[in-house]
């Protein structure tokens, strides 16, 4: 009787009964892997500051240039690690949001677009470690294209995941969804108008902030 009433309660609220993550160890690995990536980025910036690196005058990609710091391969490895560890997260997010909230034609489309864009962003970020400034190609064209693919994929992915969150009924992540809809896109526009390193760092920080909080909710670590 109790079980039956519980099922009916979920049906009445338009929610589906939450399901536990199938692979809890993998879930923890993905979340803590992303957290480690953030720590590695911060550590790299702090160490690089002893060689004159500054967030207000140096772009993110300059961490991967031997003209700026003596250990550019560290940044290349961080990019590859960050892209690899966060790539599977897109599928967990799509699964969790689809299971947790009532499906509609539009929500499924948003989730699919978010997952695909996220994968594109992750693959692009992995290749940022390959086509760093030291291997940027003629006129830095390879690095420029990969950067556009990477950050573009992340921003579009966050937008569609956030759109699904905001439009879902009784979602606990409304504030995070509003953040994802506004802040990354606003920073992209600001960067296009005022191309300064600090805005690029804010953009990377907003992407990492959104993904960390979303991962925490998805994986319940």
Where are these regions (language model features)?
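Cytoplasmic juxtamembrane regions at transmembrane-helix boundaries
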Residues: 91-117
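Short, Lys/Arg-rich, polar N-terminal cytosolic tail immediately upstream
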Residues: 1-22
């Amino acid at each position: 009787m109790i079980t039956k009433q519980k099922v009916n309660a979920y049906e009445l609220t338009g929610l589906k009964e939450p399901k536990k993550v199938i692979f809890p160890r993998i879930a923890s690995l993905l979340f803590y892997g992303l957290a480690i990536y953030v720590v590695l980025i911060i550590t790299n910036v702090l160490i690089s500051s002893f060689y004159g690196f500054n967030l207000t005058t140096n772009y993110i990609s300059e961490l991967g240039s031997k003209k700026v710091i003596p250990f550019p391969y560290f940044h290349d490895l961080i990019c590859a690690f960050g892209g690899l560890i966060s790539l599977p997260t897109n599928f967990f997010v799509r699964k969790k949001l689809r299971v947790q909230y009532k499906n509609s034609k539009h929500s499924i489309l948003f989730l699919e677009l978010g997952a695909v864009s996220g994968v594109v962003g992750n693959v692009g970020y992995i290749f940022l470690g390959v086509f760093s400034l030291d291997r940027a190609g003629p006129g830095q064209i390879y690095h420029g294209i990969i950067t556009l693919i990477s950050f573009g994929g992340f921003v579009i992915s966050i937008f569609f995941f956030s759109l699904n969150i905001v439009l879902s009924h009784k979602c606990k992540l409304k504030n995070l969804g509003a953040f994802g809809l506004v802040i990354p896109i606003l920073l992209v526009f600001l960067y296009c108008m005022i191309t300064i390193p600090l805005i690029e760092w804010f953009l990377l920080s907003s992407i990492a902030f959104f993904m960390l909080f979303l991962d925490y909710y998805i994986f319940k670590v």
